[in-house]
């Protein structure tokens, strides 16, 4: 029986490449001249740490990072934007955790969408991925198209199509 897996993963090397391009853009932009701006990636904890002088620059930097991630093929939903910035002396800091894996609520939402579609497929939750099996590949492709059109709150990738 054909099947595929639904996951939410961010390739750390691709993320690092996107951040390197963002750093290079910030150093060449006129409005960031002589600014003490830093973008660091903690690969173990999967957190992007941004430090700059004021909140206006912080918003611009976050926009640059999201744009560069999109150009590298990383969905903006992979970043947890809920953490607000905080001040540390004259600097403003912000941590952007990178989401890896699908949480329980999103799994339930995805499975409900699949079951409500009426297709003859079976979703099964396995840790941080969802395996969808069906009798026809066409049914699986319909589910992929359906999930791409819906907003489930996480960046989804479809892998292991067999």
Swiss-Prot record:
<dbReference type="InterPro" id="IPR036183">
    <property type="entry name" value="YajQ-like_sf"/>
</dbReference>
<dbReference type="InterPro" id="IPR035571">
    <property type="entry name" value="UPF0234-like_C"/>
</dbReference>
<protein>
    <recommendedName>
        <fullName>Nucleotide-binding protein CHU_2278</fullName>
    </recommendedName>
</protein>
<dbReference type="GO" id="GO:0005829">
    <property type="term" value="C:cytosol"/>
</dbReference>
<dbReference type="Pfam" id="PF04461">
    <property type="entry name" value="DUF520"/>
</dbReference>
<keyword id="KW-0547">Nucleotide-binding</keyword>
<dbReference type="GO" id="GO:0000166">
    <property type="term" value="F:nucleotide binding"/>
</dbReference>
<comment type="similarity">
    <text>Belongs to the YajQ family.</text>
</comment>
<dbReference type="InterPro" id="IPR035570">
    <property type="entry name" value="UPF0234_N"/>
</dbReference>
<comment type="function">
    <text>Nucleotide-binding protein.</text>
</comment>
<dbReference type="InterPro" id="IPR007551">
    <property type="entry name" value="DUF520"/>
</dbReference>
């Amino acid at each position: 029986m054909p099947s595929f897996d639904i996951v939410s993963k961010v390739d750390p090397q691709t993320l690092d490449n996107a951040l390197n391009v963002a750093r290079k853009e910030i150093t060449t932009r006129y409005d960031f001249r002589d600014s003490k701006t830093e973008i660091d990636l903690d690969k173990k904890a999967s957190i992007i740490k941004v430090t700059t002088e004021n909140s206006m620059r912080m918003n611009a930097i976050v926009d640059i990072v999201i744009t560069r991630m999109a150009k590298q093929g990383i969905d903006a939903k992979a970043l947890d934007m809920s953490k607000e910035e905080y001040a540390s002396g004259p600097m403003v800091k912000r941590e952007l955790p990178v989401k890896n894996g699908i949480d329980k609520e999103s799994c339930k939402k995805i499975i409900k969408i699949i079951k409500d579609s009426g297709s003859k497929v079976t979703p099964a939750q396995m840790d941080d991925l969802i395996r969808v099996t069906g009798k026809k590949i066409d049914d699986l492709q319909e589910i992929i198209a359906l999930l791409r059109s819906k907003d489930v709150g996480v960046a989804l990738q479809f892998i292991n199509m067999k």
